[in-house]
Amino acid sequence: MSVAIVDYGSGNLHSAAKAFERAARSMENPEPILVTRDPDQVFRADRVVLPGVGAFADCRKGLDSIDGMVQALNETVRDKARPFFGICVGMQLMATRGKEHVTTDGLNWIAGDVVKIAPDREDLKIPHMGWNTLDPVREHPVLEKLPLGPKGLHAYFVHSFHLAAEHEGDVLARADYGGPVTAVVGKDTAIGTQFHPEKSQRFGLALISNFLKWKP
């Protein structure tokens, strides 16, 4: 049993690996956490994590630069139905396409476009940076027993774009930043968070623990 964190030149790999290792240690049978650029290791993994920071097009280019990586992701997640966790731009890459400066194809696991957030208040600046609560949209095992809502724990966001999903059923939670912002998506065995769980302290560790325990 292993968890593969994909290294494609984007993402807080060290922070993500440490957070997943810490969450894994709390489990009865911890799964080894592996940071890898090897598509074969991704294909053999029991769970896959795709972090990402920066521009959508740059992150997609980084994935494409590793021969066989996109195929390995599709076969592992879509065909073999292994649990997948996309973080920040890693979550955005689950969309049909990104529209950050240029239109770029995503993995097309969740129908929708990645578009710029548009707060309806002038005092709210872009990027959306800092702590925010989550409003649940539908139940999901990865969100089970997490304190959500206006009095819940906070998650840490740093982003200017979000995934505007075509189907409401693919949205698990939203944040409010002068309007609704997609915070968590989920479909089949894949989930994604716009915020950074590895920077979200107790809330983030609880979420990662739920993902590691999840048996879809």
From Swiss-Prot:
Key word DNA damage present: no
Cited Pfam families: GATase
Cite the Gene3D superfamilies for this sequence: 3.40.50.880
Compartments annotated for it: namely:
Cytoplasm
For this UniProt record, the keywords arranged alphabetically read as follows: Amino-acid biosynthesis, Cytoplasm, Glutamine amidotransferase, Histidine biosynthesis, Hydrolase, Lyase
Give the pathway listed in the UniProt entry for this protein.
Amino-acid biosynthesis; L-histidine biosynthesis; L-histidine from 5-phospho-alpha-D-ribose 1-diphosphate: step 5/9
Q: What is its EC number?
A: 4.3.2.10, 3.5.1.2
Catalytic reaction equation(s): 5-[(5-phospho-1-deoxy-D-ribulos-1-ylimino)methylamino]-1-(5-phospho-beta-D-ribosyl)imidazole-4-carboxamide + L-glutamine = D-erythro-1-(imidazol-4-yl)glycerol 3-phosphate + 5-amino-1-(5-phospho-beta-D-ribosyl)imidazole-4-carboxamide + L-glutamate + H(+); L-glutamine + H2O = L-glutamate + NH4(+)
Residues in the signal sequence: none
> Residues in the active site?
C88 (nucleophile), H196, E198
Citing just one GO molecular function, the answer is: lyase activity
As for what it does, the entry says: IGPS catalyzes the conversion of PRFAR and glutamine to IGP, AICAR and glutamate. The HisH subunit catalyzes the hydrolysis of glutamine to glutamate and ammonia as part of the synthesis of IGP and AICAR. The resulting ammonia molecule is channeled to the active site of HisF.
Q: How does it assemble?
A: Heterodimer of HisH and HisF.
Please identify the protein, giving its name as recorded.
Answer: Imidazole glycerol phosphate synthase subunit HisH
Q: Which organism is it from?
A: Rhodopseudomonas palustris (strain ATCC BAA-98 / CGA009)
Give the source lineage, highest ranks first: Bacteria, Pseudomonadati, Pseudomonadota, Alphaproteobacteria, Hyphomicrobiales
